[in-house]
């Protein structure tokens, strides 16, 4: 498949044109024209690029790519090394950010809901779905369930939350700023990847459970699901590689 055809295929699947983002979605660094072997991962880190070189990949597809708004345009240090690896080995780099958060099937939010057994009921606002657990559970039990499913112990604040949790809202990655919207909407718990100092005060003062389950851990699902979709619907050879990250 041509590199531009792959870009078009995924753009159409994720409906990228309909979503305003703060990073370019699609082909970010051009490599060889023909793509057959692909490595995927959450972030285009040097470790992931090194794995792509080792495996002889023609392309790398990630959720967190390069060239973010506000990023310095200077190419030196870490950025230079990453780009050098891609260009020297003629490897294409693709990134899909918010489109891979929002997709109702392959998206990070949809995948996290499926992993945790949450029935999606609707959206509080874009990128912030809400839903219900199959049965109400105590806050500590939900923390243990999240740890078992994600392989990472979440930071949990349940100081003033209800005795049991059933109605939840979530936003994968760095979605902690949405906790106030979730509280106003009326949920028992809010799940995201990261935590800020003020997030804990918001949880305590608005009476809901809060779980920070890891930016990386909550966003493995989307890129893994996209990898599986490509393997099932094309003749491409796609390998998802999880580079460990406790954050």
Swiss-Prot record:
Disruption phenotype: Cells lacking this gene show a 2-3 orders of magnitude drop in survival after exposure to ionizing radiation as compared to a wild-type strain.
Record-listed a divalent metal cation 1 binding positions: 63, 101, 219
Domain of life: Bacteria
MF GO annotations: identical protein binding; metal ion binding
UniProt keyword list: DNA damage, DNA repair, Metal-binding
GO cellular component: cell pole; cytoplasm; cytosol
Function: Provides significant protection from radiation damage and may be involved in the degradation of radiation-damaged nucleotides.
Subunit and partners: Toroid-shaped homohexamer. In the hexamer, 3 dimers assemble to form a ring-like structure surrounding a central hole.
Entry protein name: GTP cyclohydrolase 1 type 2 homolog
Organism: Escherichia coli (strain K12)
Encoding gene, per UniProt annotation: ybgI
């Amino acid at each position: 498949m041509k590199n531009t055809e792959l870009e078009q295929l995924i753009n159409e699947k994720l409906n990228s044109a309909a979503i305003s983002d703060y990073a370019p979605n699609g082909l970010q660094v051009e490599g060889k024209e023909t793509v057959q072997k692909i490595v995927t991962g959450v972030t285009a880190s040097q470790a992931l690029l090194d794995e792509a070189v080792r495996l002889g990949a023609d392309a790398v597809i990630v959720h967190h790519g390069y060239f973010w708004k506000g990023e310095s345009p200077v190419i030196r240090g870490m950025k230079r090394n990453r780009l050098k690896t891609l260009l020297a080995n003629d490897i294409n780099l693709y990134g899909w950010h918010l489109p891979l958060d929002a997709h109702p099937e392959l998206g990070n939010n949809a995948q996290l809901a499926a992993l945790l057994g949450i029935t999606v009921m609707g959206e509080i606002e874009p990128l912030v779905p809400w839903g219900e657990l199959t049965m109400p559970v105590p806050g500590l039990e939900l923390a243990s369930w999240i740890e078992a499913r994600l392989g990472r112990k979440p930071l949990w604040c349940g100081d003033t939350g209800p005795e049991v949790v059933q109605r939840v809202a979530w936003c994968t990655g760095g979605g902690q700023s949405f906790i106030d919207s979730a509280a106003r909407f009326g949920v028992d718990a809010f799940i995201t990847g990261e935590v800020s100092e003020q997030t804990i005060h918001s949880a305590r003062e608005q009476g809901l459970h809060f779980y920070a389950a890891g930016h990386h851990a909550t966003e493995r699902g989307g890129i893994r699901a996209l990898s599986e979709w490509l393997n099932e619907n094309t003749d491409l050879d796609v390998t998802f590689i999880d580079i460990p990250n406790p954050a």
